[in-house]
Structure formats: C-alpha cells, structure tokens
C-alpha cells in the first residue's frame, strides 16, 4: 500500500520491477502454506537494500557453512579404501605410507573447520541483523498502522491485543528470523551436499534414499499447517486472558475495594484452560512431526545398510561392480549424518511456523485500510471553518461494537457560526456522539455532516481536526510533562502563525527542556538554551494555562510546567487534568471549540472563572458545549435537547423554559433554589441527596484554595489511579516485583528452589518426559555401535554370504531403532507438552493471584506499571514454562547423549576417548560464554523495548485524544526515538554473542581432525581395530554436535532463567492473611503448607454463571459507624506533603454524610483510608468500634461498597461486571443483579441490547457512554447490599432524570446503610444529615446544608452559582 500521508517516508527510491513483483507475490493473503507465510514475513514488510544484502550474504554463507562436513565423508571413505587395500585383517596395521595420507587429511579437516567458522559467523551475524531490523520494522509499521486506523477499529480491539502483539508476537518473530535461519540454511545445505556426494559415489543407493525426501517435507509442511491452526486458537484465548490481567492491574483500587481478585482470577483461569487444550494438541502435532522425521531418517539408513551390503557382497564374489567399500562407506556416512542433521530441523520448523503465524497476525493490522485516515493527505486542506455553518442532515449512527443499538436516529440541526450552541439531554442520548461525528472520529451510517456547503468527508481529516479545539468528558493526557501536553494542541493547528513551530513540536527539544528543569535548572536558563521558538511555545502554553485557570496550580508545583503528569495524567487531580486539557484546546486558538462536559470535574468557583474566560475567547468562535449542569448552558445562543438519539426541542433557555417541555422539567429537577436577603433557602429540590461537592470559595479565596490543593501537592485517591507510570525510572525495574534496594538479586540455586513448587505437581509427566529424553539421547550411542559394526562387516575379505547376512541384521537393527525412537519422541513431546501447559497455567494463575493481592503502595512503587507487570503473567510465565517443555527435553537428551557417548567410548577405546574428551571443556566453555552474553542481551532487550511497548499501549488507550489533536506524527516521532538506543545496543550484543555461537559449532570440526589423527595413530600402533575406531568416532561426534544444538537453545534457557527469577521474586512476597483463609479462594490445609500454591483447580468454576448461596435476609440491617481520630497521612510518593493533617470526623450509623472542600483537600484520601488502601501515619480509623489500622486483613471491606469517579469495567459480560460487587462468599443471582440495575436505572438499557446481560464489556466498557458506565458502577455497588456506601462523584456523568432515579434508589438503601458522598453538584447533598467542610486535610466546619449556608460564605456562593434562578 502506498502511503501518501504525514507518516510516509520522506523520500521513496525507485525499485526494480522484478523486486516489486516479488514483494507483491509474497504479500498475497491467499498464499496458505507455511513456507509462503514465512517468506511473506521476510519480504512482505518492504525490506530495504541493506536487508536484501544481509539476506543474500547470510544465505550464501549459510550454504557455505553446510558444505565442509559432507566433504569429510569423502576423506573417511578414502581412508577405508586405504585400509582395505592394505589388509583384510582387522588387527594388522596399515603400511607406513598411511601416515602421510593422515597428515594431509587432518590439514584438510582443519581448513574445513576454519572455513566453517567464518561462514557460520557471517551467516549468524547477517541473520541476527535481519531479525533485529525486521522486528524494528514491524514495530514501526504496526504502530504506524494503529495510528492510521479509525476509532471504530480500536473500539473493537481486545484490550490485551496490542500488548500481546508487541511482546509475545514480536519475540516469536525475532526468534524465528534471527540466527536460527542461518543454522537452518546450513542444515539444508548439509543435507543437499550430502546427497550430491552420495550420488557421485554410489548413485543407486543415493537414488533409493532420495525417495524418502518428499516424506520429510510432507511432515514438515503438513505439521506446520496444524501448528499454525492451533497457534491461532491459542492466541485468541490468551489475548482475552491478557485483557483481564491488564484491566485488573490498571484498576487495583476497585479490585481491592470489592475483593474481586478471586472472581477475576477464575475468569482468567477459564480462558487459560481453553488455551491449554489447543496447546496440548499443538504439542502432540509437533511431537508426531518430529518423530516421523526421526523414523524416516533411521529407516532410510536401514535401507542404505541393506542395499550397500548387497553391493559389497557382489564385489566380494567377483561380480562386476564399480562400487568400492570406501564409496559405500562414504554414502552411508554422509547420509547417516545428513539424516541426523535433518532430524534437528523439527524444532526450527516449529519456530518458523510460529513466527509466520505471528507475522500474519501483525500484517493483518499493518495492511488494513483505514476508513478514516487521520494521517492521509487526501481531501481539501484549504477550507476555513471560521464563519461557516455546521449542519447535521438526517444523521443515523450506531457504534461498530454494538451495531444493533441505534445511537442517533435521523438527527438534523444547524450550528450557527461564531455562536454558542449547547447540547443537553439524558445520558446515552447521543450528545457525545455528535461531538465525535463533528471531529470525524466516526462517519454517519446515513445522512451527512456539512461545513458550509461541503460534506465533512471532502475535507482533509488532519486539517479538519486542526481547526477544532476539543475538551473531552474524560480528559486524556499523555505521559509527558505539562508543557508538552499543552503544546500538543499546537501540533496540528490550522493557524498559519503556528506552522513554524511544528519542527520543534515533533522533535526532542521540549522533552530535553523539561528534563533539564526537573534536574534543577531554572526555567529561564533552560528555555534560553533552546532558542526563541521554544520560548514562544512556552509563552503560548503559559497563556493558555492562564485562560484555563491552571497557571496557579502549575506554578505551585516544584517543577512547574516541567512536571510529568504520569500515565493518563495520574499525577494530577481530576480538576487539574481537565484544566490542562482545556489549555491544550485553547492554545491553538481554534475557530471551532467543542466542550464535552469540559468543567464537570471542577468546583463551582473554578468553573465560573473558566466560563468567564471561555466567553471572552469565544467571541468569534463557533462553540458547541455538552453539559449536564444546566447552569453552564443557560447562556447559550441555542440549546438543543436530545433524548434517545433524537432532537426533542431547541431554542434559548428562556424559550425552552417557557415551553414547559423536556428542558423545563430538567430545570426543575436540577434547580437548587434562590436566596432571600436573609440567606435562607427559598426552594428546595424534592430529590433524595446522595453526593457531595468540592465547594470552593469565592474569587477572594480561590488562590488560597489553589495553594492548599497544589502547594501541598495533595492528591485525592480517586484522582490518583493505583498505577503510576514513570518512564524515566521504568528501566531500573521493568518486571522485578521488589525494588532493588529491598530485594537482592536471586541466585541460581534460590531461583531453582523457588521454581520447584510450580513444577512439583507435574513431576510424573516430567519424569516420563525425562525417561524418554534419556532414551532419545542414548539412541545416538546405539546408532554409533550399529554403525561401527556395520563398517567392520562390509570388508570384502569376509565373503559375500557373510556380508549379506550382516547387512540384513544391522539394517533390521536400524529399523527397530527407528520405531523405538518414533515412539519415544511422541511420548516425550506429549509428556513435556502437557507438563509445560500445566506449569504455565499454574504459574500464570499464581502470578496474577500474587499481583492482585499486593497493596496499592506496592503497585504505586517506582517502575511498576500495569504494562510491565502484565509481562510477568504473560511472557515471563511462558518463558518459565519452557523449562518443563521441549527446551528441557532437548537439554536432557543432549546430556544423555553426551554421557552415553563418553562412557561407551571409554569402554570401547579409552585411549582414543580420553584424548577426545579433553576437548569437551573447550566446547562447553564456548557455550557458557555464549550463554552469558545472551543472558545479558536478553535482559537488555527486555528493558530496552519496554518503553516502546508502553508508548504503544498508551497511544491506543488514548487514541481518541491522539486522533482529535492529530498527534499521530508526534507519537510516531516519540516511538521511533524510543527504538534507536535499544536497536544499536542490541546489534552490538548480537554480534558479540554470535562469535561464541559460531565457535561452539565450529570447534566440533577440530574435534573431527583430532579424532581422525589420534585414532589413526592408535590403529597404526595396533592398539585398536577399525570397528572400535568407527564406534568411538560417531559416538563422540554425535555428542559434540548435540552440544552445538544445545547451545542454540541458550537464548530460550536465558529467557527462562530471567523469567524464573522474576516470578520467584513475585511469589516469595508474603501477604497479610497468608496463614488464614484468603479471599482468593486458597486455604492452607496445614500449618506448613504454603498457601500461595494451594487449591489451583484445573477446571475453574464458571464465574459467569451466577449462583445463589446466601440470602439477603442474612445480611446485617444497619449501617456502619465511622470515626476518624486525629488522622495524619502522606502519600508514599510525596512523603513531604501532608494529605490529611489531624483529621477528626464522626459519622453515626445510618447517617447520610457529605465531604465538601476544594480540590486536593483530602476528601478522597479519606475513602482510600476507609478502604485500607493505605495506613495512616498516626491516628485511628474506627469502624463499628474496631480500629482497622490495628487489624490484619481487610475482611471489613465485605460490607463496604465504593462507587469511584472513574468508572471501571472489566473484560467479561455485563452480569459478570455487576456480580463482581457481590460479597466474596456470595454469588449474586440473576434476580439480584437485575434488581440492582433497576435501582441504578440501567436495566432497560441493558435489556435493550441484543445479548442483554450477556453482552461482553470490553476493557473500560468503551461501548457504553460515560453515564451508562456510571450507572453500571452504581449497580455493582448496590448488589453488594453494603452497610457503608462510599460515593465519589457517583452521579457526575448522569443527566438529571437518571440522577433522580438513582437518588430515589439510594433513599431506599439509606434506611439501613451509612452513606458518605463526595460531589460537585450541591443539589445532591443539601439534604445530607451532616456536611463536613474539608480544607488542607482538616475538617474546618460541619453542619447541615442550611447551617452552612447561614454561616459559610464560600458554601453559600457555590449554591448561588449552581442555581439556574440566580
């Protein structure tokens, strides 16, 4: 596909037509064979000339590396002829002229060894670079493709899919396109060269054996087809499981609050069980494929021995024959060795098939055509949106994730230029969808959106979005500095005055600037070093921050504009994030401004100031705002009222109120009232009130409160998600579960000991696998014995009948060996495959269990991000499981082969064996050095690309913001910069490691030379016979060749070693309640039983099926009493800044209380301490008379429910998500779930879905609107039947009608529940039993709504501001 957009290469070099056709051929999707799939992987990603040169050179060198060994067969054949021509006696020494021939042949072997080393180093180096360059190209193309895709595509993308593609699939592809390719080519070259030599020597035998070659390829490709099929199925299940892990680790506060870890773990286990069955089928298929290769190889040798013996017998009987004993020996020797080498292809075929399958999965996304490409240069880029009318004409729309659910139904209205149009309506009525269509994040199903007289589809997407300033309902910030986030608004600005800023915005200058400031440089000095353009950007950012009322809190931060906001803005409060997002929109000075609940997270005073600023800057701007607070919409020039995807009415505030229609009803529901001169409330809402407000002060107190909020740096827990991503520190601890300063590095012995409990349940399978591995290893020694006796029996001096009978006997023995090895390999593969999958299941479940049980403080530690912790459960667990799979099988068979060969050689001819054995330490040393180099490489590689993966995941998570501000090019630049340093470092490590790999392989040829020379010397001296020599020689040479294969597995062993250390570290962490029954469902059966490894079910229960256990009547019927006594607390990440300072409050059982105060005053921190996410530094928190700070465990949470401000959905059905709220020992029934949904006013919405309560929620519930997600969260809390209900802005995203329904439901619950609420909307708390005013971490006032209005000016000012009648 030709890319003409902003992310296309700056220059395109013309390519030859033949190369273009080659690329197109291998890129064809209808090519189904694994071979073409693999070539499609190599050539379908537009490799450059350097890549082609590396492939060509690596292929030639690989071919060259395979040629020397078959030539040795000719030398050995000549030796046999020399021996046979000298004497027919096996004890008589050859003549003295034999010494000169030995010296010549030894030198030839040494030359072959040097040639082999050079060729091997070249081909391993070339292919390693090919693999490194290929995965880098795939990373960039995959990331680029994700940036190009329309939002509808990412909406339907499984949440764990991106991580899986960039971690698991990339690792598989790199393993299948690196040095192993060169080794594979060398093997094929070896095989072909061996047959060429065989045909030159004895064409008849060679032709017979050639007939079995198609069987090799049939098994290789047929097995590859099924392996690919099962790999695809496994990937589907693993992606779903990864999604659960990712969403769980991203929302640990919810997991802890509801003790949901057991249910999430069970759902995770279900997906693993499904994947395990396909993985077992894949392992059996692979073992059959591998076993057939061995069977064919050994059976062909049996045929060769039998036919060769007949030819030699004819020669011995004087019949005409051009065949010599040496020629037959050469054919048997080279084809025997070729068969051995070919049998080593099976593991490579498995790796290549997996790589091709992974490549196809990536290429599916890479080649996908985007319906709305924000990077394309197509469309009109000259049209101006200033002073143009915007019109929706009969628009219908439904989201791709829910195509059966209509969102907009024939919507038509006009947005006049340079006017303020407000859109109000019920939750889920389509308001935010209208904004998405105006931004062209989606296209209408029917109808059109027009700007002036142009259809929106005719305008260049980037130009359109660059003319619009968007503030979303849930503001998303990228993990950069505040300065960079605000400056993102300039990247695609349509204003000509901003064009010259683009090179700086896309480069590293701003990142370098903020890094210098964080390291201690003053802002003025750092800006001066960067130049005038950077200074201009900083000034623009400051001006925008001033307009959005953010400048005061920014200046109060230690690093100011250079402060990193964390992942998704986690280091900032909700109100602060919203103000930064508003500054990002205003900095581009757009002709169109879209505000989707732009001030929903702000206190009343801040909202009023921002509204005034917006009024000023939007004098000549077309403004479209969405609001649930009608007070922010009443001054609009036109108000559009929507319900159920239709426009119900429109007009000015006064007109709509006068009509007494839908809008007037909303006004009556939301109006708090107006005040008389005596400050008494004239009217009150009839609603039942459940939430709170962050009441800020009047203008005179605003700066004071900003100081309280920001100079102290206090973050409410709701404003600070559990996971903080800190890229500058991430590399220091990518996956280790304990900080380095706390946890020393695991020794090898400690790692092995810690891993044993994971493997112990599978010891029977592993033992069976080890026994068959030993049988496979020893079979090579048996082959050497048969081979040696065969060579001795083919002497013409023995007579024809004897030769024929010996040939028949040893041919039969070889066939028996073929059958035995075939059976052993199948049993071996099945046993190790099943053991590996069971170990993988156990490791992943236990790893997730341990992660979900860690406290929030642990998750908040530096370097622990959800993306990096996911790797512990996915790639690390997979790497560890390989130690109970094929890797350990090959390792043990190699060791068995080595020991059996050494022992047999010493028994048969110890003088020859002892000299050859002396070379073994050299061989092993080269392998150990390779292991050390590769271990260091794997660790560096794992760290290096973690940041690039995190950037990609963050981009997908924030794709709507990326698209809305056309940040594709900026994100692409940051991503590419993150790849440069790791790429250079990895290339050096690869080239260094391949030196030792080549040496480990090539040194075996020198062993050939030494064996040839020393063995001949012993034969000359009459110490040993030819039979003894030809038993010892292949026995030891097969052993050394096996060692070479073992060293090829070094990278896998290295990965497993690192992974095992990481997982053992994780599982070694002790948790509160390990000695007791814990909420994950594991219970120690004895005092000495480690509860971490208990009760792992192979068939987990179906957590989607809701079962009745405990009846509601068994629950307590009164609320909890809560007391805070002189509580002091500081967040671990900010130990010098108090969050709570001597807080004391008292909440009686059954009361409805509210916490009110400025942003960052400590309100949500009280919720975090009530849930025991953290422990206070001092003071007491008493629930029902028990001080929870002095109690172990968190059983008290069983009767507490939390509704967070940021509503979280997990991968699973709607019923599952709501059922997560049930108490740990209870499964909510379907009736209870539906009742909770009715109370939350969401039942009808769910019932209208095609799958109803079985509708699958994607991570974060992207297919639901913000209000719908909030109602689902409320239902989840209500199904718990809590005694204490914590509501953190629980109705902020609801329309007034839904809010009334919810509050009516909460009024029923309040009779036997204590409710504590935080809210901005004062109309939701004015009937609270007690309202606590929190400022600076203290309770500065308390009372009823009326009492606070009378004596607290700031509270009264907020009431006035929120009143529509004011």
UniProtKB/Swiss-Prot annotation:
Glycosylation positions in this chain: 84, 620, 976
Provenance organism: Trichophyton rubrum (strain ATCC MYA-4607 / CBS 118892) (Athlete's foot fungus)
Induction: Expression is induced upon exposure to amphotericin B, the allylamine terbinafine, and the azole itraconazole.
PROSITE patterns: ABC_TM1F, ABC_TRANSPORTER_1, ABC_TRANSPORTER_2
Keyword annotations: ATP-binding, Cell membrane, Glycoprotein, Membrane, Nucleotide-binding, Repeat, Transmembrane, Transmembrane helix, Transport
Annotated compartments: Cell membrane
Any one annotated GO CC term: plasma membrane
InterPro entries: AAA+_ATPase, ABC1_TM_dom, ABC1_TM_sf, ABC_transporter-like_ATP-bd, ABC_transporter-like_CS, P-loop_NTPase, Type_1_exporter
The keyword Cell membrane belongs to this UniProt entry's keyword annotation: yes
Disulfide bond residue pairs: none
UniProt family annotation: Belongs to the ABC transporter superfamily. ABCB family. Multidrug resistance exporter (TC 3.A.1.201) subfamily.
Principal location: membrane
Origin organism lineage: Eukaryota, Fungi, Dikarya, Ascomycota, Pezizomycotina
Stated name of the protein: ABC multidrug transporter MDR2
Molecular function terms from GO: ABC-type oligopeptide transporter activity; ATP binding; ATP hydrolysis activity
